[in-house]
Amino acid sequence: MQAQGTPLPVAGANELESIQNQPHIVYLREVGPHYGEVTVAAIDGSSPKSLPTPLKCDRIYYAASSGICLLYDTSTAAQNPLTHIPVWVTLFGSDFQPRHQFTIDGSPSRARLSPDGKYAAFTIFVTGHSYNDVNMSTATILLDTNTGASLGNLEEFETWKDGKLFQAPDFNFWGVTFAQDSNRFYATLRNGETIYLVQGDVAARKLTVLHEGVECPSLSPDGTRIAFKKRMGDRWQLTVLDLATMKEIPLAEKEDVDDQVEWLDNARILYQRANDDSQNWMSVFVVPADGSGEPNIFLQNAASPAVIREQDIHRLSPSLN
């Protein structure tokens, strides 16, 4: 079943526009009949309630009036459970109606958009279902959101390390995060048992190794730090990397977190992990980005948050400045 796009009624459309004119968050519901429902809510709580949209997804991201939705095609799985399950990749607009759609075999994992909404990136597992799996294989693909056209798999880009071309048959890439200029991005590369942070250039189709041990990077709004998950024995520790000094700061979250985090602002990050109860539903937590404080629930029974900040709204609407 592909991501559905039934237009909102007029009242709902007006409420959506009202929320979109202020800082807000787009996320997935995690419980009950509304599981996977893409939902929008004002960050400051001034909106009387969260607003559901017509889309259902397994992973989403949203920026600059554009979004990407990854969704298992469960109808195909029911018909033939022995085949690969197609994933619907949907690019949608500010009305949460699909603009471009296609399918790809795999398991949905990560999704991101550039700050200006020009490019989208997504990662699927081609084999395996976890980054713990040493035999897993990924595909990470860049898209032009205007046309829906593929800009290539990161495995097709040239990779450089220590000033030399770096090549190996077992490269796996995942977890793209874009800089403000949209051309520059960061991602994870695994070669053998070694994990690297790479910096990418969309136009040059080039990747450069920067640092070791960085999985699922997420660039801060000011472009100075990367939040990521760091392998610590049998778990992942949320950590922040200062790009100027390459100093790493472990965050106060002590639970195992397998997520590509989202920055709420330059001081706090959001991420999904299992609730501290027996139900094991996901919730979105918030924790300071400087290693202080403690984690707290930001959105109960929710996942895959995408934050639209004040400066993002002004970028889209210069008349508001």
What are these model-predicted stretches?
Residues 1-321:
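Sequence signature of WD/YWTD-type beta-propeller architectures
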